[in-house]
Amino acid sequence: MKIFVCEDDQRQREHMVSIIKNYIMIEEKPMELALATNDPYEVLEQSKELNDIGCYFLDIQLEADMNGIKLASEIRKHDPVGNIIFVTSHSELTYLTFVYKVAAMDFIFKDDPSELKMRIIDCLETAHTRLKLLSKESNVDTIELKRGSNSVYVQYDDIMFFESSTKSHRLIAHLDNRQIEFYGNLKELAQLDERFFRCHNSFVINRHNIESIDSKERIVYFKNGENCFASVRNVKKI
């Protein structure tokens, strides 16, 4: 899930970015801070390119000709179930969100920093839960990567390949923009879906995310720029 922050106060924006990045890093959620800006048009343009639902933290009062509520209304035209959270110092403006029918997830008031952090994290947790539920309803294939006391849910389409780890009984999932170490078995992963193929003793690849194959050097290149080796026997089977 991609996260967008539109806030015209630079200090406030940087504080929100810090909260979001720390949450993603510590909790290892399948999320990415895609954009933090004071330009509502930049958020709108990038939101149109999403293949999945987004999560938007929007300041209601922006120093632009498009305020946060109007921005949310425009986002709703192409992301009807996205998570929209308004961040504001003006509680009296919240009624406008009902006028524009944007169905906001939450209203967070800036006045209390500790409350701000807690509410942002609550919204991210709720957005993550909604994403899992929507993925099941829309038959989007996901895999649970177990990391001991917690798990990370990842969509098949985000996986480039799996690799054996130097640590016993652990694997590394190479995703579009990050890596996750987890407990697993390559043999079992290769049997999950037809798109997964064990091309080497140490690798299971996602055929759907292959960019190209160098058969001579036995190297498989992926859409995110990474690569892995294939065995002599299996390179032709990919």
Swiss-Prot record:
Source organism superkingdom: Bacteria
SUPFAM superfamilies tied to this protein: CheY-like (SSF52172)
A single MF term (Gene Ontology): DNA binding
Domain HTH LytTR-type: 143-238
Pfam families to which the protein is assigned, alphabetical: LytTR (PF04397), Response_reg (PF00072)
InterPro entries: CheY-like_superfamily, LytR-like, LytTR_DNA-bd_dom, Sig_transdc_resp-reg_receiver
NCBIfam families recorded: quorum_RR_AgrA (NF046049)
Protein name: Accessory gene regulator protein A
Naturally occurring in which organism (per UniProt): Staphylococcus epidermidis (strain ATCC 35984 / DSM 28319 / BCRC 17069 / CCUG 31568 / BM 3577 / RP62A)
Gene: agrA
